[in-house]
Amino acid sequence: MVQVGVIGGTGYVGAELIRLLSNHNKIKISGISSTSYEGKSINSLYPGFYDLKELVCEKDDEVIKRSDLIFLALPSGVSEPIVEKAVAKDKICIDMGADFRFKNESSYKKWYGKNFITPKLHESSVYGLPELNREYIKKSRVIGNPGCYATSVQIGVLPLISKGLIEEKGIIADCKSGLTGAGKTLSESSHFVNCNESFSAYKVANHRHTPEIEENLNSVSKEGVKLTFIPHLIPINRGILSTIYTTPKDPIDIEKIHQKYCEFYKEEPFVRILPLGKVSKINNVRLSNYCCISIHYDSENNKLIIISCLDNMIKGAAGQAIQNMNIVLGFDEKEGLTALPAVF
């Protein structure tokens, strides 16, 4: 069995990763690390992980030593030195922060305030959106797992961008996320009394997923994508719903657009295109690795509207990381990820 380690295994994403990996038939969790909880067992932090008594938080180096592949569930800007060390020891790394989501160093510096530490590592890394980069992922040793909003928006518009069907400047992505998207660290915005029975936008036109979406869509763009992205927090635990407004270049037949989506994603194991007239919703995807898309046309205003939903903790984070692991290790891409969405 492949030995898999988790660096930063006690946050929401790390815990979700451990939960999913525990049901994977091709790997064994070799260890988890945490600077905050070193020496504590994972089931003392998450009692629902009762059967994982043997998983005790260790130092990063101990986990790296015993692992063939490393997941890094760390804050953005922290992973790169650890990845450099692990790659030198011939380990495969899947980083779930933003450290390897960009090829453009100036863009990364503008939005994250850091330069690349090891530029050659970035040259060889791959952006881990399977629906865009599957063939590159297969050959990579360093994979930058996409952001949750970025995954939802890109899967939503990839068929339109790649086929040149819409105006690529002026796309509007209006996105809503559950509170787990804000992470485990306490904050005013995620405090119960500030989010319960409320609904708010944040980082309006200033969210770090904007340049990530633009850079990676531009790999298939003909004109250069420019995006207005407005994220919102809603008082649910998990899930993202992205409503994406686009302007078709030419008069469209909505049935033909629907057919193009079905054709574009027909080989994708985790993308679901709803029939025309149906509306995608978070309950279509909760607790699953699926991205569910519905397609709508406002003929009065010539707006093609895409609604893209996913579970931000799974297809938006831990599940997509496991999907990337399956690809790079040559496993069935669906291994460990076949659970259907929860009904409610």
Swiss-Prot record:
One of its GO terms (molecular function) is N-acetyl-gamma-glutamyl-phosphate reductase activity. It is found in: Cytoplasm. GO terms for biological process: L-arginine biosynthetic process. It is an enzyme of class 1 (oxidoreductase). GO terms for cellular component: cytoplasm. PROSITE patterns: ARGC (PS01224). Keywords: Amino-acid biosynthesis, Arginine biosynthesis, Cytoplasm, NADP, Oxidoreductase. Its main location: cytoplasm. Its EC number is 1.2.1.38. It catalyses: N-acetyl-L-glutamate 5-semialdehyde + phosphate + NADP(+) = N-acetyl-L-glutamyl 5-phosphate + NADPH + H(+). The active site is at residue 148. It comes from the Bacteria. Coiled coil: none annotated. InterPro entries: AGPR_AS, AGPR_type-1, NAD(P)-bd_dom_sf, NAGSA_dehydrogenase, Semialdehyde_DH_NAD-bd. Pathway: Amino-acid biosynthesis; L-arginine biosynthesis; N(2)-acetyl-L-ornithine from L-glutamate: step 3/4. Catalyzes the NADPH-dependent reduction of N-acetyl-5-glutamyl phosphate to yield N-acetyl-L-glutamate 5-semialdehyde. PANTHER family: N-ACETYL-GAMMA-GLUTAMYL-PHOSPHATE REDUCTASE, CHLOROPLASTIC-RELATED (PTHR32338:SF10), N-ACETYL-GAMMA-GLUTAMYL-PHOSPHATE REDUCTASE, CHLOROPLASTIC-RELATED-RELATED (PTHR32338). Belongs to the NAGSA dehydrogenase family. Type 1 subfamily. This is N-acetyl-gamma-glutamyl-phosphate reductase. The gene is argC.
